[in-house]
Amino acid sequence: MGSSKRQFKAMLRKNWLLKTRHPFVTSAEILLPTIVMLLLIAVRTRVDTTIHPAHSNIDKDTVVEVGKGNSPSFPEVLKLLLAEGDFLAFAPDTDETNNMIDILSLKFPELRLVTKIFKDDIELETYITSAHYGVCSEVRNCSNPKIKGAVVFHEQGPHLFDYSIRLNHTWAFAGFPNVKSIMDTNGPYINDLEMGINTIPTMQYSFSGFLTLQQVVDSFIIFASQQNNDLPLSHSNLSSALRFELPWTLFSPSVIRMVPFPTREYTDDEFQSIVKSVMGLLYLLGFLFPISRLISYSVFEKEQKIREGLYMMGLKDEIFHLSWFITYALQFALCSGIITACTMGSLFKYSDKTLVFTYFFLFGLSAIMLSFMISTFFTRAKTAVAVGTLTFLGAFFPYYTVNDESVSMVLKVVASLLSPTAFALGSINFADYERAHVGLRWSNIWRASSGVSFFVCLLMMLLDSILYCALGLYLDKVLPRENGVRYPWNFIFSKYFGRKKNNLQNRIPGFETDMFPADIEVNQGEPFDPVFESISLEMRQQELDGRCIQVRNLHKVYASRRGNCCAVNSLQLTLYENQILSLLGHNGAGKSTTISMLVGLLPPTSGDALILGNSIITNMDEIRKELGVCPQHDILFPELTVREHLEMFAVLKGVEEGSLKSTVVDMAEEVGLSDKINTLVRALSGGMKRKLSLGIALIGNSKVIILDEPTSGMDPYSMRLTWQLIKKIKKGRIILLTTHSMDEAEELGDRIGIMANGSLKCCGSSIFLKHHYGVGYTLTLVKTSPTVSVAAHIVHRHIPSATCVSEVGNEISFKLPLASLPCFENMFREIESCMKNSVDRSKISEIEDSDYPGIQSYGISVTTLEEVFLRVAGCNLDIEDKQEDIFVSPDTKSSLVCIGSNQKSSMQPKLLASCNDGAGVIITSVAKAFRLIVAAVWTLIGFISIQCCGCSIISRSMFWRHCKALFIKRARSACRDRKTVAFQFIIPAVFLLFGLLFLQLKPHPDQKSITLTTAYFNPLLSGKGGGGPIPFDLSVPIAKEVAQYIEGGWIQPLRNTSYKFPNPKEALADAIDAAGPTLGPTLLSMSEFLMSSFDQSYQSRYGSILMDGQHPDGSLGYTVLHNGTCQHAGPIYINVMHAAILRLATGNKNMTIQTRNHPLPPTKTQRIQRHDLDAFSAAIIVNIAFSFIPASFAVPIVKEREVKAKHQQLISGVSVLSYWLSTYVWDFISFLFPSTFAIILFYAFGLEQFIGIGRFLPTVLMLLEYGLAIASSTYCLTFFFTEHSMAQNVILMVHFFSGLILMVISFVMGLIPATASANSYLKNFFRLSPGFCFSDGLASLALLRQGMKDKSSHGVFEWNVTGASICYLGLESIFYFLVTLGLELMPVQKVMSFSIGEWWQNLKAFKQGAGSSSTEPLLKDSTGAISTDMEDDIDVQEERDRVISGLSDNTMLYLQNLRKVYPGDKHHGPKVAVQSLTFSVQAGECFGFLGTNGAGKTTTLSMLSGEETPTSGTAFIFGKDIVASPKAIRQHIGYCPQFDALFEYLTVKEHLELYARIKGVVDHRIDNVVTEKLVEFDLLKHSHKPSFTLSGGNKRKLSVAIAMIGDPPIVILDEPSTGMDPVAKRFMWDVISRLSTRSGKTAVILTTHSMNEAQALCTRIGIMVGGRLRCIGSPQHLKTRYGNHLELEVKPNEVSNVELENFCQIIQQWLFNVPTQPRSLLGDLEVCIGVSDSITPDTASASEISLSPEMVQRIAKFLGNEQRVSTLVPPLPEEDVRFDDQLSEQLFRDGGIPLPIFAEWWLTKEKFSALDSFIQSSFPGATFKSCNGLSIKYQLPFGEGGLSLADAFGHLERNRNRLGIAEYSISQSTLETIFNHFAANS
């Protein structure tokens, strides 16, 4: 094997070539993420940014004074509580609390009327959340009042006063602005990225009354503390104080104002804030396509077994994965670079460009690893792409749950284990930092803006990559797989492999035993004991030298649900060098399992095999250095050239770099592909691909070649060329060949082994097996006319044991036993005499004796290898069926279980509907409208049916029968197809369920308690001033006193500054207007100081103080300027001031006030009503879920067209309209299930946006219309696909993008005023997509509820809400369905090139009945001039004259000058596929249609079946023209296509029932007709199995049965036995023979590549070459006319032990005759046997003597034939490798040959020489054909003036004993020889 580095480079080059050969797809992978970015950039450029100059922010709207204006005073609060009947709560229920209420009640008497005291905070919360909260009568003194707010004390002195102000979520007062929510205490405490001013927190604090309560409580604390500085105010001293006037106002903060900080100049970018919530999703959608492609690549190579093929050739597992990782890492690096370059000036203008690149690149790496991990679960690319893409998208959903500031950091990190979630969280950081014009940089990635820092997001994506990689590698080893070794789950932690190897080695039997020991176990009950031909001494020597493959007791057992199944049972087999072993066996015999174990794809259960001395268990790496495999299915890349394939595999096999090019060129030349070396594989024919696979197996000088059905699918001529190639390369190699072709096995196999039930039943040469198992010869005689009675007594007189096997038409066949060989000569002479007399008598016209034995011709054929196979392997005809039952994948088994249950229960869908009385009128109106629409559609259907079907469908019951049958077909298939069920029901349901669940699980915790303190400011500071600087105006005396007691920061004195705001006069005027002429200028001065001193401290400032002078009543007033980056800054600095005032008032510096903001918990009613579900996200989830449904609509449609099942239905009589209408109805009904589930989920999750009052009807209408519109639009898209897997993936992506991305883009554009008008215009085009209409309608409903729609849109049916979507969807349902019918009439690739007139002509043709999809190329009359100048054969001309003259008008079928020409292109001219074809087919005739691939057979059948339209000429079926009346002739035709056109999920019985209905079998006879066919084709035991579980043979049986259902008079069979093993093939032949020749009622047209099949079935055969009919006639007629030789195979008697011993003794005597030997020879002899005086010719063993080259030459001279040994040195012709080569190779490798081996070779050569001399003298003109060391083959001249059969048998039989002939056989030229003759001359 090649080095790891070279293998890695080869894999990278392969990946690179695969990418570059698909430039569009690769470009899309790279650019689609960029396109999403460009769309955002385009929107971004339309959004204008606003530049805000520096501003003081002092105006009427921003200056707030507590208790004035919109901020309610405490008396106003109490009055409002009284008016609404609500209460203000206090806790705990202590004396201090009651005293406070008593004192405050003196000043505010209404307080006692609205006060409710609770024992403690817990009792308060329990009451608030209880079910009876707020439930009371309208009587004022109700027991369960609503609580609007509460004051809860935690400490009540003497030094610390700690309390919480708790407000209700619905706190709002009539007459004040509607504050939708109270302060958010769960949000970030500080947001340094906030730009400008954010007045919302200030308004919330002031409007809600929080500051009012804070002022009242703090004033009371200051007042009460002044009464007793040491003790808290008690009830005792309070009672005495009540008699005096209390100093209420002393140090009381009576005037409190709040003003925001000034702001510097900034640019407001609303774009980032708008797209922030959807940015992560949009980015992710851009990566979906490259992710789907990566999953597809990973699984495709596994699905197509390419990966295992690479492993077989020596590729290391880790290199395979690493190559794909590097490939996509480079691709994502390029993509990330492009994204960075495109966004550096727009989306990420302020961020570090390297950080942007790192962000996208790390996500790309994690996506690669996630895709790899996902791919390990799948073996089918189609399923993997669909589910993998969904999984990838689903990994984003936790983002909706954790994207909340209240979610803990730990939960966000855990969610970030899903890389899409980590990616989306990172996008939030980008949006926040970009909006702040700061940008993300390496210096600030530690600071979080979304609760999790950008650094953590990057780190998690990197960690995810490593985690996914580890999991993927582990799962790839342990998950079940179709090929390769599956590791145990704990292989990482155990020494499993070491123990396994040792255990297996201990069980391996000794390899020194004979190949087939005498005590070999034979299964009980087998009809035959194993039979093996003996081997030569040279072969035994190979076993001793380790130059062969030795399989010993190889055993493989599979575990299944039904128990263990033995696939290979103690296999014993040896393969030798320079030989080809053909391994035969029925399907499931164990051949493929054996090969899989030999190449290392499967581990053996027990036993072992040594390949060139290396164990397959312990030394597989060494074996693969010499191993070349040509698998059954080509492991080729269509996008690579021949050279690139050979180069890649040469590197894997270790070919040196210096010789790589020459090795590749030589191998291409050796396999006959030198002229195609730079051709892409997809442009190669099937035969060329097999040659390339063969070259791949041979390259690197592979010594062991395994060929698994190397010629499958080839025509006979290409097959012969491949056989010659395989013969050519077998020298010096060990070749194992498996095949179903007996001719191939016989032609190539030096030895043939037959397996059955996992064991080897026999092994030997072809002639050995034939004579051991053969039944003799087949004699075929052709009578002069059908009425002539052939004298069978001629045959029986000579051979009484002869049996008649068939008599059809003019031919009769006899089976002659082998024992009758001596009688053949006399019998043939009498037959030839009768032939001569028949010719003489035919000249006398008046003699008409029907009893005269007139024989026109005769032929003889020997027992075929196929008959041997049938005797050995065909004894148990059910073996294939048993294997089908046993070897079923787990997926299949589960499917079968489901099918069983489906058959027991019928589908009974129920339509449930409900409505309330209020909507009754609306529903009634809609129902009437719906009935009108149905009537209109029905009328339209009637019109279309008249146009398409020729008459009204209402009067045609057959139309409805077809619709019903097709509907049942779709229903059954869909219900059993787990993928369809998953796509249509499970995936949408699960996706919708979990998506809504994630949104519902989005945390909505109770608002937490926060302490209003400066401790959170500047956390890096330490010491007393931990809160940072507090700018303080000390110009007022009281200010200096208060400043001394300030804590929570250090005082920064106000200084004069020269800074002025822009427009200073305007700023001053605003300040005076807002705060008055005294305070206004002072506030402006403070703001100017804040601006000028911005950079004087590295610590942030969050508040500053301006104090008024002390008021006359002793009260104080002050103004707090607060920083907008902290939403709690205002009340925090109020608390700082009040605590300082308390200390000043009491003179106690240890006293303080601590205020907390802790909103009350939501009430039970509020919790039910508060579904803070993001409506827009809900619409996205619904749209994504429903995007999978149209993909499920497309799959069965494209798949039916792909396997030609659709065409099979159309030619069986189905009309286009019935096909599409039944499909449409089923798809709509199936759509109702996920739609109903969606409605149920809407109710379950309380989505009032969709099912609330007035919203249910539009939601249901949109769902139903969406089902109709999306189905019909999907039908239109299906015409653009030829592969269902590609259709599923692309259509899924189309609906993803058209429905989701367009909706998101439209949503974003609609929110931005600058793009709103453009959005309204674009929506008219976007709505052409049903997905957009549906998602936009749902989003509009949801956004209407959120108040985000236009104010003009009040009703749900408004045009801009759901009206447009409902109208568009309804129209699209009809429009797209009509387009579908139009596309059916005109293929998509021709729509653009067709003019209206041509389309109309095609429509007229369709009206006349050409109801299938036309695939006819448009060709002008100029093609009529294309012709070929070739004279017709005389038989062909006679047939043509007979048809043209009208003599065949009464026949069932005749073709008349049928011609088909395909148009050319700019590179190639027109191609004539069929040229003037003329012949007829009679009733009871089986016409064989033979020809090479591309000869025109399938095209001819396509024209007869209506799939193609002739260019010129026509054909007549029962006198009806196939061009003029295509529909009329279909009822007479049964068609079996070349490839099974089956529905994989329908059972065998259901297939037959479907086509019985289609073909018009009456209902009451369908069961009988179907049962008859099941019995006739031996399918009764499979009747309830779905077709995908059938073997290839049973599938072909079903296809033929479908063609014969309804007993059509004409049956067309296109290669009906392809892929069958001989047992199944013989059964099929018998069925077809009964149909045609035996019943005499049906005409059969048969195409085949098997000449044996044509010989067995066809009464007449026509051979097509180049589109023309070259010959026609019965099989025997063709063989008699074109056959010019006999095939002779002779095997001499084996060399006996006596002969061998005597010959060795002669040579020993001569060798030890020392005086006569030269000294050099004596030296060699001493070396060979050692020097010992005791050694004599009598005591020396022959096996101890090794002959050197000189000794061999001397011995040959002594024996008198020195020339014979010269063949040991020079090579023989390349086309044949004889015994000489093996000895020659051993002689030069080992320096000598053992004497017994040389003796055996010499004696064998003597026998061959004698035979050759006899044959050359007895049969002049005989030519040598081949020799395999065991037998020789000759071609003998035969025919006019040549040898007769009687002469041939007579010569051989008379000289048989004299020449020592063990076995011989003579046969005539085969049909294959004649076929190859015509093919070679084409």
Curated annotation (Swiss-Prot):
SMART domains per UniProt: AAA
Record-level GO cellular component terms: membrane; plant-type vacuole
Subcellular location as annotated: Membrane
Membrane topology per record: Multi-pass membrane protein
UniProt key word Repeat: yes
Residues annotated as transmembrane: 23-43, 271-291, 319-339, 354-374, 383-403, 408-428, 454-474, 933-953, 981-1001, 1178-1198, 1225-1245, 1250-1270, 1290-1310, 1366-1386
UniProt KW keywords: ATP-binding, Membrane, Nucleotide-binding, Repeat, Transmembrane, Transmembrane helix, Transport
Major localisation: membrane
GO molecular function: ABC-type transporter activity; ATP binding; ATP hydrolysis activity
Domain ABC transporter: 549-782, 1453-1691
Record: residues binding ATP: 585-592, 1491-1498
Any Pfam family the entry gives: ABC2_membrane_3
Entry's family note: Belongs to the ABC transporter superfamily. ABCA family. CPR flippase (TC 3.A.1.211) subfamily.
Annotated protein name in UniProt: ABC transporter A family member 1
Organism: Arabidopsis thaliana (Mouse-ear cress)
Lineage: Eukaryota, Viridiplantae, Streptophyta, Embryophyta, Tracheophyta
